[in-house]
Amino acid sequence: MKRAIIHDYLYVHGGAERTLAQVHAIWPEAPIHTLLHLPDRFPPAFNDMPIQTTWVNRLPATSRLARFYSLLQPIAFSGLHPNADTVISLASFGAKAVRPIRGGRHLCYCFTPPRFLWGLNRGTNLSGHVAPVQMIDTILTRWLRRWDRRAANRVTHFIAQSRYIESRIARIYGRSSRAVVHPPVNVDRFLNQPDTAHGHAGGNDGYLFAVARFEAYKRLDLAILACRRLGMRLRIAGLGVDEARLRTLAGDDPNIQFLGAISDETVAHERAGCRAFLFPGEEDFGLTAVEAQACGKPVIAYGVGGALETVVAGVTGTFFSEPTTDALADTLLSFKSTDFNPDDCRTQALRFAPDRFRTALHHAITILEGEPGE
């Protein structure tokens, strides 16, 4: 059985790329096809993977223009025909367009339908731009949506990364998912992190911690405004296009601290010292919330999306029900981290360990390789 792995692109090392590394561990002989690859942005282990790029990788200034070039996925992937009985795509956008050989299977592990295309990134459209830009954006979006739905029809079977994404695949593509396999989280590096909260975890004198890309849909604005209102300490790690707005919301409040882009080791240290991890956005899965629980820390999350699959209410965290400052502030006022057992948090995190992911995905792929398409 010949297999080929397809990944949208390799220009940033995030959760999707960590998932790719685990899929490669299952089928190390399978070639990995991707739009483009910037090796200097990835751990050395990626240099040993059988990565094959499209013609886009040969375009000029790929390092600077990688995000722009990602819009070429419909052209680049539509012409890709790997010699494999089973195509396994790890896709949000273009990778699901690859056609298998005649009689072959295309099994898509779907992270999400593209956020930028289906209005899933609140506050990131072009509605504030001048009319000609809006018109171009509308025309391009309509074309890309039609193409995205056609690409989804090339998939034999979908596997969703969460129940939340399963429902999104059904709503946008009209397709069912044959399995749900939660993505892998490297929990081992957090499990033995010493707690450095120094006895303040149960009161309001300890700090709250959040880490995320600074984008509007992450809703860090709610965390900032709620903590300012209550006089609670908040430490935020990350960078992104929303930084200027978030800093304006924080003003000169000394309780709100921006840490910038910090190392994984520093993130782990910050988590170990907090009294709770804030997770205020509507997320597809919730990798950072799992990492926080692996540190033995409870999570305060917006009660929708992937958070409902990664956090156990009253056991490893608590939810606020509306995406408003008032709702989050009310939850923060009633929250006491001494109500949560760190061992329960760590046990929950272990459900998403890489070995469990590899076992579950291998089982799902093996079954679906023998089944006819929809």
Label the model's feature ranges:
Residues 29-96:
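Active-site donor-binding segments of glycosyltransferases and PAPS-dependent sulfotransferases
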Residues 126-158, 166:
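Membrane-proximal helix-turn-helix segments that form the acceptor-binding/catalytic region
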Residues 208, 272-284, 297:
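Acidic donor-binding loop of glycosyltransferase active sites
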Residues 244-266:
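Nucleotide-activated donor-binding/catalytic signature segment of Leloir-type glycosyltransferases, i.e.
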